Amino acid sequence: MPWGAPVAAAGCGLGAVRRRLPVGPVARRRARTAARVAAWSGAGAVAATSLAAAAVSGLAAFFVRQVVRPVHERPDDVRVLAVDLEGAGPDGPVVTVTADAQTRAPGRYVLLLDGGRRAAQVGRVVREERGAVVRELLAPPEGGLAPGSARWSGTVHVGDPTSALGLAHEDVRVATPLGGLPAWFVPAARGRRDVPEGGAGSTGREGGAVWAVLVHGRGATREECLRAVPLLHRLGLPCLVPAYRNDADAPPESAGHYGLGDTEWLDVEAAVLHALDHGAREVVLVGWSMGGAIVLQLATRSWTADRVRAVVLDSPVVDWRDVLEHAARRNRLPWAAGRLGIAMLARPEARALLGVSAPIDVARLDWVVRADELRLPVLLLHAADDDVVPIGPSRRLAAARPDLVVFRDFPGAQHTKEWNTDPERWEREVARFLLEHL
């Protein structure tokens, strides 16, 4: 039966009733009350819908602000439960920490203490017991280690290249329109090139003609890049490790928020120019996480791209839309809030609400779609267990450009922890790739 039929029949019936029954004061009051209730009900429905839309918009804006807002200090996230420095057992000194996904992960890590001022290096998992993980204690911190709170980190090398690695370095400034960006410069090793087993050969580049420019990820610091410096140093590549806008030790841009690579590539371009001005003829770009997104933007948007010889990406953000949708699901945001937040990034009128200086074109940051624009050889290292930047877009990019992209999965590694999980393999893969392309 058509939707209009019952309504019409009811209307006719109501009219017939009105004609038959007298309408007194009580009936009129009841009718007025019913009309008011109906009016308030309709207004309430509209208000509820408006409130729901406002709530979704608010959630979307809050979500995006958390993504673009730099975080320079992170809270402690693990507890040290016990420390055995005597090493009476076969495993030597050990430390017991609360168990979770990160403390169970294989490899080498650090416990950051006192707000990151001290660090204890830990190694393999010795055993797991009720709610706790016992790991090798490779290097206790100065001042000792005792039960208490700490922060778990994959940035094993804490400090600068000299204090953390024993490599001579210079503190330099990279000139940009925003001001000087601090950077570490590590000269190449002189003489014989040492390469990991399985990567025999030489770069054939004497005199530092090829430099490496290393770019850290979102929320990290230049220390994240130090894991790669010893290998690159042995391969004869001078290393330049710059900060970029909105880092704690770098000038902020006007809004003080990340551009997700859409603006930061200009700072890495300035670092490449610094290298070219100081003796480099070509560069290798190495980027972690958002640093990978930054590197990819430079490789296609900068006039210096023709001086880039090769690219190494570790856990890179290949498609920001995929990463943001994944983050929204992890944070249990309504589907509409996540999608709206992504759409808001590109809207000029949402800049003030989101705290960004310019709209961010997420489509321009999708390298699966833009795969045919790549012109440089890429080594792409990623882990299937990465729960921050999913591996899917990296796999799709590698499948789209097998002529340029060499893809290597690191089972069991978490986000940007490929080196931590298997440093020997990481160095072997990077050395083999660079020796082939330099």
Task: Cite the ranges covered by each PLM segment.
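N-terminal cap/lid segment of alpha/beta-hydrolase-fold proteins
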Residues: 144-191
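Short, surface-exposed "cap/lid" segments of acyl-processing enzymes
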Residues: 177-195, 204-251
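Hydrolase active-site cap/lid region
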Residues: 301-361
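Short beta-strand/loop motif that positions the catalytic acidic residue
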Residues: 373-375, 380-382, 386
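Catalytic histidine-centered segment of alpha/beta-hydrolase-like enzymes
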Residues: 413-427
